[in-house]
A protein has these predicted regions:
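Short, conserved loop/helix-junction motifs that constitute active-site signature segments
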Residues: 41-44, 155-161
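C-terminal catalytic histidine-bearing segment of alpha/beta-hydrolase fold enzymes
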Residues: 178-228
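Short beta-strand/loop motif that positions the catalytic acidic residue
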Residues: 165-168, 172
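Alpha/beta-hydrolase-fold catalytic nucleophile elbow
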Residues: 52-53, 115, 139-142, 167, ...
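Serine-hydrolase catalytic machinery in alpha/beta-hydrolase-like enzymes
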Residues: 2-113
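Short alpha-helix in the alpha/beta-hydrolase fold that links the catalytic acid
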Residues: 32-37, 152, 176-186
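Short, proline-enriched alpha-helix->beta-strand connector loops that line the catalytic pocket
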Residues: 159-164, 190-192
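Primarily recognizes the serine-hydrolase "nucleophile elbow" in alpha/beta-hydrolase
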Residues: 103, 108-159
Length: 228
């Protein structure tokens, strides 16, 4: 695997499920580490949470300032983003390598979830919906789909019905809720049925949202355990 630093947290010993969770622009893998004990997974099989750090790169919309970013954002508009497609695809490759790493450690792809906040969620969307093997689900928080054609032209048959938890703040002034709803519309056009949640918050995560994520994740893990 190419060099990537990360944080790992196991909810209990001997995990049989994995969640690969991508942070937002300018943050790092520690950003969502505190969420693990708040998800209420004590009764579930053990889960390994992997929080990778995005590479450092200049971000055009921030004056070329170098920060952790999954891809360069060239311009910000209320209803769109101009991004560096190459960087987005490179980040998808990082996620694929992390999936392969978990498979080698004994967790099959169908027990691996992808999660992400803001641009990390965009990476989760693309990585999951174009992955050639079935995955367990996607948690997409305060995010968007910046390059629709990358998904529509390469939608994986293995993940055409993947479960999706999608959440957005109604007062988000960084990634507008309109962008989140555009993503929902695109997913619907692809035949997917995301579970949509909105909260009266800005570009952040709230405790009600965390509880809803935990409820959804517990239900999805229970479904995995019940599967033949």
């Amino acid at each position: 695997m190419s060099e990537i630093t990360l944080i790992e947290v196991d909810s209990a010993a001997n995990p049989s499920v994995a969640v690969i969770w991508m942070h937002g622009l300018g943050a790092d893998g520690s950003d969502f580490e505190p969420i693990v004990p708040e998800l209420g997974l004590a009764e579930s099989p053990a889960v390994r949470f992997i929080f990778p750090n995005a590479p450092y790169r200049p971000v055009t919309c921030n004056g070329g300032y170098v920060m952790r970013a999954w891809y360069d954002i060239i311009s910000l508009e209320p209803d769109s983003r101009q991004i560096d497609e190459t960087g987005l695809l490179e980040s998808r490759e990082i996620v694929r390598q992390l999936i392969q790493r978990e498979e080698k450690r004994g967790i099959p792809s169908q027990r691996i979830f992808l999660a992400g906040f803001s641009q990390g969620g965009a990476v989760a969307y693309l990585s999951a919906l174009t992955h050639p093997e079935p995955l367990a689900g996607v948690i997409a928080l305060s995010t968007y789909i910046p390059e629709a054609k990358l998904i529509t032209e390469d939608l994986s048959a293995a993940n055409r019905h993947i479960p999706l938890f999608v959440a957005h703040g109604t007062d988000d002034d960084v990634v507008s809720i309109k962008l989140g709803r555009q993503a929902i519309a695109l997913l619907g056009q692809c035949g997917l049925k995301p579970a949509w949640h909105s909260y009266d918050i800005p570009h952040s995560v709230c405790i009600d949202e965390v509880r809803d994520i935990g409820t959804w994740l517990n239900a999805r893990i229970s479904a995995l355990e019940a599967a033949p």
